[in-house]
Structure formats: structure tokens, C-alpha cells
């Protein structure tokens, strides 16, 4: 499962995500959020407060192209 660490948050996706639109699971401690990449929106969040979620969305937007490249590279195999 490809994982990209950005400012302490693990952005990852799973092989079973292949049939879904591009997204990442963002993990930190025991918290997790699922973020769609096109457009960048929250699908769900467990454990993050609104400030943390806002930061995660900002990081996702800032790294959107990079995350999409990893997604496309992984699932084009």
C-alpha cells in the first residue's frame, strides 16, 4: 500500500481502492479520514477535530498533483 508522509500525516491508499475514484486515507495516531482527490473533499473523518481536518484538506490540496501521480502510477500497473 503506497504511503506518502506529509508533515507527520500518512497519506495512503489500498489495493482494494482500485475501483473507487482517486482518494487517500489520512492517518495520524489513531485518527483516520478519507479524502477524495477530485475535488478535494472529506468523505469521512474519525478522531480529527475541525482544526486538524482543515489542515489535512490544505495539505491535500497543496499536494494534490503529487498524490494523483502516485495513485495513477500504482493503479496503471
Please state what every model-predicted region is.
Residues 1-20:
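Short, charged/polar N-terminal "headpieces" of proteins
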Residues 5, 9-10, 40, 44, ...:
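A general marker of short, structured functional hotspots
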Residues 49-77:
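C-terminal structural segments of small proteins and small subunits
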Residues 1-3, 32-34, 67, 76-77:
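Generic detector of short, locally flexible boundary/turn motifs and exposed helical patches
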Residues 14-50:
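A short, structured beta-strand/loop element
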Amino acid at each position: 500500500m503506497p504511503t506518502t508522509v506529509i508533515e507527520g500525516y500518512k497519506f495512503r491508499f489500498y489495493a482494494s481502492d482500485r475501483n473507487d475514484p482517486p482518494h487517500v486515507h489520512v492517518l495520524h495516531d489513531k485518527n483516520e479520514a478519507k479524502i477524495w482527490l477530485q475535488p478535494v473533499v472529506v468523505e469521512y473523518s474519525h478522531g480529527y477535530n475541525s482544526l486538524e481536518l482543515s489542515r489535512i484538506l490544505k495539505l491535500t490540496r497543496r499536494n494534490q498533483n503529487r498524490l494523483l501521480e502516485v495513485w495513477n502510477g500504482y493503479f496503471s500497473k
